[in-house]
Amino acid sequence: MTTKRTYQPKKRHRSRVHGFMKRMSTSNGRKVLARRRAKGRKVLSA
């Protein structure tokens, strides 16, 4: 029996855990977005 790959991508899970709405819902998440804006990231969140 072999171990499975741990990354099984799902669009819904990705956006719910790391998405923009999730980031905006907490104060620390807003800090993350602010940092990424300050750094000049093209993509702010998943």
Curated annotation (Swiss-Prot):
Gene Ontology molecular function: any one: structural constituent of ribosome
Name of a matching Pfam family: Ribosomal_L34
TM spans (from-to): none
Annotated source species: Lactobacillus acidophilus (strain ATCC 700396 / NCK56 / N2 / NCFM)
The protein, known as: Large ribosomal subunit protein bL34
Keyword rRNA processing carried by entry: no
GO terms (BP aspect): translation
NCBIfam families: rpmH_bact
Source taxonomy: Bacteria, Bacillati, Bacillota, Bacilli, Lactobacillales
PANTHER family: LARGE RIBOSOMAL SUBUNIT PROTEIN BL34M, MITOCHONDRIAL RIBOSOMAL PROTEIN 34 FAMILY MEMBER
Keyword Cytoplasm on entry: no
Region spans: Disordered: 24-46
UniProt xrefs under InterPro entries: Ribosomal_bL34 (IPR000271), Ribosomal_bL34_CS (IPR020939)
